């Protein structure tokens, strides 16, 4: 997760984007200009790779890519009408707005990378190998913690000169070490 992206960084990106790319609809340009002109709105804007799971999103496309020119959705309602989107953005300026931009070379754009954030609603997908590594790390951590706890209890049993507890804990420690191997 990257650090918070400043309002100025987002505004600079929008200006760069509009200077570099021609939107498929002029209304998309108007909406982006409106957003960039209002810090209180920019504060709630998040640029993401996909809008999956987002409660409120705006998908905009520049010429040169195969995707819808303009989509706005809030909850289960989706529209291609820029006026409805503009109206919602203007009235609900203090709600999170996730923006997905489609343009040539978006994936390799350093400017876009600076403002792009992880979609907090998208589940992280791990490969089987990564899951196995995570499971092994968790198992190892729990084992190490448990072993240290038993060693601490052995020290306490020695300090208390409690032979019965000491021998019981040594057997537990030996079993733990056998299972680990």
Swiss-Prot record:
Pfam families attached to this UniProt entry: IDEAL, UPF0302
Q: Which Gene3D superfamilies match?
A: Uncharacterised family UPF0302, N-terminal domain (3.40.1530.30), Virus Scaffolding Protein, Chain A (4.10.810.10)
Q: InterPro entries from the entry?
A: IDEAL_dom, UPF0302, UPF0302_N, UPF0302_N_sf, Virus_scaffolding_prot_C
Read off the HAMAP family from this record: UPF0302
So what family is this one in?
Belongs to the UPF0302 family.
- What's the protein name? UPF0302 protein LMHCC_0635
